[in-house]
Amino acid sequence: DHHFVLSANMHGGALVANYPFDGPNSGSYSASPDDDLFIHISLAYADAHPNMESGGFSNGITNGAQWYAIFGGMQDWNYIWEGDCDITLEQHEIKWPNSNQLPGLWNDHREPMLSYIEEVHDGIRGIVTDAETGEPIVANISIQGIDHDILPDPENGDYYRLLPAGTYTITAQAFGYLAQSETVTVPL
């Protein structure tokens, strides 16, 4: 019963890794608070693909709204409401490829999918509990400079937060407790 922290939607009709945000204006870049992270995980997929960078998008990735705006898309919803970093993987220029093309598509996307899944290990994790009772605390976990907080699992207090390599100040705060901050480094 843990929250997802990384997921992907798979579509056809283009060859690109598409990341949030998908709105508000079509043709305009719409950065999420975790824009650097979304670029990083999108590139992890695109760079492992044999020809995604030749799909008409710079480095094989695009910001959703910069490509075309939609509202109520899964990747934006997952990020905003669940803290799940979700991108849309457009896997082939043809929306409905012939069945005889599927083995080749699998071969093209197998390693990129594995590279993408490995990104789940980049970031931080921890457990927030009461020092005296050991009971989990539903604390707000914030990263200085990134306006997108997460909550730990209420049953055991654990949390996972994807972050690209860098140094971050993490703060946990909950009603009735003193806020606790730590500076951590996420390695390359």
Residue ranges of predicted features:
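Metallocarboxypeptidase
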Residues: D1-T129, V138, Y159
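Short loop/turn segments at connectors of secondary-structure elements within structured domains
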Residues: V120-D122, E135-I137, G166, L178-Q180
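Generic short beta-strand
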Residues: G126-I127, D149, I170
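Short, acidic Ser/Thr/Gly-rich low-complexity loop/linker segments typical of extracellular
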Residues: E135-P164, V184
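A short, solvent-exposed beta-strand micro-motif common in secreted/extracellular proteins
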Residues: G157, A165-G176
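Structured interaction patches on ligand/partner-binding surfaces of diverse proteins
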Residues: F175-L188
